[in-house]
Amino acid sequence: MNDQPRMSKMRRYHAAVWDEPVIMEMGSKGRRGLVFREAEKKVADAVGPAELLIPQGMQREDPPNLPELSEQEVQRHYLHLSQETLGMMGISLFGTCTMKYNPRINEIIAARPEIAETHPLQDVQTLQGTLELIHNFDLILRELSGMDNFVFQAGGGAHAAYTHCCVTRAYHAERGELAQRNEIITSIQAHPCNPATAAAAGFDVITLPLEENGYPSTDALREAVSSRTAALLINNPDDMGIYNPEITDWVDIVHDAGGLCFYDHANFNGVMGKIRARELGFDACMYMLHKTFGAPKGGGGPAVGAYGCSKDLAPFLPCPV
């Protein structure tokens, strides 16, 4: 009998691979996942036809182009997709824009007590290492973006976009133009946090539609810009990965009208090292450090929205707390 210990043979990583069509190509006509019951007669008599509850201008003229599948088919479809979406520690579900791989060493460093267990009210002398990290990373982001200042208070991308909306308000208020400049322009394919934070900050939102090339036309922007324009909030590339090659013209148009330009770098992976926001003319930008960079994301740690701006906007940045 061989007393030598048995060595397990390492296998190459493998996961399920399905030849899965997109859901719009699946199903059969007339198939249903849920069949609604007919309304009781008393309810129907009291409420009337359901279509009368929808304003005429909002009623569809044609039936929606939706796939017709059973509940089991939908469940099986997304189960197959989930089995092909494996990360280092299991399924990776979280994220709306360009994702990337976080080396495990990054997760280990971020979980160290010197970082994860700091408190904003502890003795500043015990935070010098953390402050040095933040300062050095500030300089790195300035190099990548061309901006003059960065702050790291924002707890995520939407928070950083809201920071810019507040900076925009303060900038125009200082110039005596806040009452006039009440509109922020974005596109329908920009990250949803851009129109949402603009509205939360009290601005009216103008959303530009897409053309066949995948981004709004420059003429549409010209029509939207006016003396009421406070800022342009835009992703480039957008959330479909399409880069707008006319972006410098957009910046010039908004600047000529007295507005500010904000670059949402949610999809920075594709352009890092190729462009710099400030050199394109943008006044401010933000990075989600849980996307292009190594901060943990999802349940693994807090997000960070690094907000950078030109020296003209620096006086309106939030102060450290």
Predicted segments with their positions:
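N-terminal glycine-rich, Lys/His-bearing helix-loop that initiates the first secondary-structure elements
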Residues: M1-E117
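Gly-rich Lys/Arg/Thr-decorated short loops/hinges at beta-loop-alpha junctions or inter-strand turns
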Residues: Q56-R60, R112-Q125, E143, A199-L208, ...
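Short acidic-aromatic active-site loops that bind/stabilize oxyanions
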Residues: P67-E68, D123-H135, A154, A158, ...
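Flexible, glycine/charged-enriched surface loops at secondary-structure junctions
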Residues: M88-L93, D148-F152, H265
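Conserved PLP-enzyme active-site core in the AAT-like
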Residues: Q128-G129, H159-V321
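Acidic-glycine-rich active-site phosphate/pyrophosphate-binding loop
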Residues: L131-E143, P318-V321
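Short loop-beta-helix segment that forms the pyridoxal 5′-phosphate
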Residues: R142-C166
